[in-house]
Amino acid sequence: MYWHRLRPPLEQIATAGRGQARMAALVIALCLSAMPQLGHAQNTLNLATWGGAYGQSQEIVFFEPFAKETGTSIATVIYDGNLAKLKQMIESDGAALDVIDVSASALDALCKEGLLETMDAASLDAAPDGSAAQEDFLPGAVSSCGVASVAWSTAVAYNRRAFTKGVPTKISALLDTARFPGKRALPKNARYSLELALLADGVPPENVYGELGMPEGADRAFAALDKIMDDVILWDKAEQPVTWLLEDKVVMAAAYSGRLFRAAVGNRSIGILWDGQIYDFDAWAIPKSSNNKTDAVRFIRFATAPARLAEQAEMIAYGPMRKSALSLVGKHPVINIEMQPFLPTAPQNFEKALKFDDAWWRANGEALNSRFAAWQAKVEAAQVAREAARKAKEAAKDEPAKAAP
C-alpha cells in the first residue's frame, strides 16, 4: 500500500553490495532521524526504535497506518541498542518514552530493574482462527514485561560452487572437512562459536547451554573446534563472513541472517543452512514512566497483529514471532521473491533452532571467554606458521633457479 514511497527502493536494500547496503541504510536512518522529536501531547506516542531498513519497515507497516487509524501520531527517536542510553531516555525528566523496541537481553535487564509495565497477553489480538495470542506466539515470545515481534539469527551459509557432490544439509557439515573441505568463517567470540560447535557435534538445541555449563561439555565444544582449527578463519566485522563467501575465501560461514538474505538474493551460489541456527528477537515494551499507557497498549496490539507482522516480513527478512503471521507471508513487494524461505522462524527453518541466551553468558561466560581467547591465539599462531612455511617453500623453489649458470 505504501511501497512506492520507499526511498531508497527496497530492491536496493535487498540486493546491494555491502557498501551500497550500508549507504542505503544510512540514508534511511537519516530520514528517520529527521522525524518529529518526542512530543508531549496526549495524541502523540513517543517511541524508541532502531534505524535502517528495519526502522523504515516499521514506519510503513506500523507507524503511519496506526496514526491514520487512531489519530495518534508516532514521534520516533532512533537509538543504537546501548542499554545505558536507553535507560537514560526512560528515566529522563523530559517527554517520557511510551513504547520501546528492544532486544531480548535489554528486555530482560529492564524488566529485572522494575522499569517496565506488566504485559497482559489478553490485550493482544487473537489468531485468525480464534486461538489466544499466548498460544499463537512462539515459545518465550510473550513475557511478563514485553512481547516479541520479529526474530533474526546467526546461521551457517555455504557456497554451492565449492561442493560438486552435494551441498550441506545439516549443521554437522561444519565439522566434516572430509566431505566438505575448505575454510570456515566463525565469529571471533566464544558466544555463538561454542554453541555452533556443540550443535555441529550433535548436541540437541535444548541441551546446549546445560552441556556448555559443565566442564566436560566445555571440553567437548573446544574439542569440536580443534577438529577444524586449521580450517577456521575468525571474523570480527559483520560484513566479513559474507564477503569471504562471495570471494571464495571460505566455503562455509556463520553470519547474520539479514546479510545472508541479501547475499543469497544477489548471488544464487550462496545457500543458507538453517539447521542449527541461533536466533534472538526484538520485543515491544512499555516503560513505567510512560505518560500515555493506553495508546501504548493499543499500539503494541496493532503492531503484533498477524497481518501486520506478515506485511513487515515481506519487506525485510526478519521472522515474525507469531505462527499465524508466518502462514500469511507472501512475496517481496518489489523483487517478487517468496520471503518465507528466508525467515528464521519459518516452520521449515525453525525446527532445530537454538534461542541465544544472553543471560546465561553474563552469568557463565568469563571462564569460557578466557579459554576461547587462548584457542583463538592458537588458531592465529598456526595461521602465521603455515604462511611462513609457505613462503619458505616458495623461496626454496627459487633457490635452484638462482644458482643455475
Predicted regions and their residues:
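A ligand-binding cleft/hinge motif common to bilobed small-molecule-binding domains
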Residues: 107-109, 252-269
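Periplasmic-binding protein-like
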Residues: 218-227, 264-290, 332-335
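Mature extracytoplasmic/periplasmic domains
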Residues: 287-353, 388-392
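Conserved C-terminal helix/tail region of periplasmic/extracytoplasmic solute-binding proteins
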Residues: 346-405
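Early extracytoplasmic/lumenal segment of secretory-pathway proteins
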Residues: 42-109
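Bacterial N-terminal signal peptides
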Residues: 22-35
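Extracytoplasmic ligand-binding site segments that recognize negatively charged/polar headgroups
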Residues: 52-57, 96, 101-246
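A bilobed periplasmic-binding-protein/Venus flytrap-type ligand-binding module shared by bacterial periplasmic
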Residues: 155-162, 198-199, 281-295, 311-314
